[in-house]
Swiss-Prot record:
Pfam families: Lipase_GDSL. PANTHER family: GDSL-LIKE LIPASE_ACYLHYDROLASE FAMILY PROTEIN, EXPRESSED (PTHR14209:SF36), ISOAMYL ACETATE-HYDROLYZING ESTERASE 1 (PTHR14209). The keyword Lipid metabolism applies. The active site is at S11. This is GDSL esterase/lipase At5g62930. One of its GO terms (cellular component) is endoplasmic reticulum. Its EC number is 3.1.1.-. GO terms for biological process: lipid catabolic process. It comes from the Eukaryota. Keywords: Hydrolase, Lipid degradation, Lipid metabolism. The keyword Heme does not apply. Belongs to the 'GDSL' lipolytic enzyme family.
Amino acid sequence: MRPEIVLFGDSITAQSFRSGGWGSALADAYSRKADVVVRGYGGYNTRWALFLLHHIFPLGSSSPPVATTIFFGANDAALKGRTSDRQHVPVEEYTDNVRKIVQHLKKCSPTMLIVLITPPPIDEAGRQSYAESIYGEKAMKEPERTNETTGVYAQHCVALAEELGLRCVNLWSKMQETNDWQKKYLSDGLHLTPEGNGVVFDEVSRVFREAWLSPEEMPFDFPHHSHIDGKNPSKAFEERCL
């Protein structure tokens, strides 16, 4: 059985298997080495994600994931009193919720590679333009998310990773290192363009490799075709690669 890598998060994870998505790129990188499984839930915050843990990551599983990315925060950081008020989770609770997710995963497998990913930065003008394109004159004039507030959640995510000894992708900071990141990386001020997906893929791949999960060093699940003798193919299948 192939090892399993689970991508757990909100819509940015749910969309990661679209054309040009970071999840599909990971699946390609680990082709025939590991199964990349997307568990993304659009609109979810960490409070709601807790209800999914025992269903997605059952305790006592004989084959828990070898690695999991936890990518929440964009919805938790929605502002109270604005259009996405229902999704808001205070930053202290967000931090505690992520900690609970990590604790559950560690119970599933003490050796699991767990990677935290911060929410991406927010392009407030882009969010406003998107809202106006959907709601017209009824669009709320005040932003439902701000880059400053989202940055606070990102900082807490990074600090929690350091506290727990986990690896972390600080997407909020990384994307803002590039000029015109707002248009280059974000399609609607929040979700990712193909270029934005590329940043996530590069960073997650880097972290996986820095840990111990390099696809180049993993065996194929079954023999490579070049190892199969056309006259005696059964020999190559006497022992599975995994």
